Design a protein with these regions (language model features):
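Bacterial N-terminal signal peptides
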Residues: 7-17
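Short capping/connector residues at structural and topological boundaries
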Residues: 41-44, 120-122, 126, 150
Length: 177
C-alpha cells in the first residue's frame, strides 16, 4: 500500500512538473519595471495592445511591450510581462524567472559579464534636465554646471557619468522620482 501511495504521489509530481514545463513553453516571460513611460507602464485593461502582467489583474503597455509582442510572435509564443524592480531584472534573468529583459538597459561592461545583449532597438544620448528658471537654464557646457547638485536614477550607468562634470555635487541616486 505504501508503495502504491508513493507511486501515485510520484506520478502526480511528474505530471505537475510536466504541466509547468508545457505552460512555461507557451509564454515568453519578459522582465520590465512597467513603470517607465513611454517605454513601459502599468494599466488596468488590455486596451491598445497591452499585455497581461503575471500574477496580477493589470496589464503593461508601451514601446518595450510592443517590441516584446513582436519578438514573442516571431517565436510562436504568448508574451507575459513579469513586473520586476530595476535592480531585480538581471537576477531574474540569470535565475530563469524571466526569459528576457526589455527595459532600455544599457550594455555596460559589468552587465555583459553576466548577461548577453541583442542589437539595440533604441538609442539615446545622456542629457541634463534643469528647471526653466534655474541658474543652469542657459548652460552650454559641462563646466557651466559647477556647484550644481546632480543625480540620476539608481542602478543606471548615467549615475557614474556625473563624476565627469567638473565641480558638480553628486547627490545620492534616486530610487524613483
Amino acid at each position: 500500500m505504501k508503495k502504491l501511495v508513493l507511486s501515485i504521489i510520484a506520478g502526480l509530481a511528474l505530471m505537475l512538473g510536466l504541466t509547468n514545463v508545457v505552460q512555461a513553453d507557451e509564454y515568453l516571460r519578459i522582465g520590465m519595471e512597467a513603470a517607465y513611460a513611454p517605454f513601459n507602464w502599468t494599466q488596468d485593461d488590455d486596451s491598445n495592445g497591452a499585455v497581461k502582467i503575471d500574477g496580477t489583474n493589470q496589464y503593461a503597455n508601451g514601446y518595450d511591450v510592443q517590441i516584446a509582442k513582436k519578438i514573442a510572435k516571431d517565436l510562436g509564443k504568448e508574451p507575459l510581462v513579469v513586473k520586476t524592480k530595476w535592480e531585480g531584472l538581471v537576477p531574474a534573468l540569470t535565475s530563469g524567472k524571466i526569459d528576457m529583459i526589455i527595459a532600455g538597459m544599457s550594455p555596460t561592461a559589468e552587465r555583459k559579464q553576466e548577461i548577453a545583449f541583442s542589437s539595440s532597438y533604441y538609442t539615446s544620448e545622456p542629457v541634463l534636465l534643469v528647471k526653466k528658471d534655474s541658474a543652469y537654464a542657459n548652460a552650454k557646457t559641462l563646466d557651466d554646471f559647477k556647484d550644481a547638485k546632480i543625480t540620476s536614477q539608481q542602478g543606471v550607468y548615467l549615475y557614474d557619468l556625473i563624476s565627469q562634470i567638473p565641480g558638480a555635487k553628486k547627490e545620492t541616486a534616486m530610487g524613483d522620482f
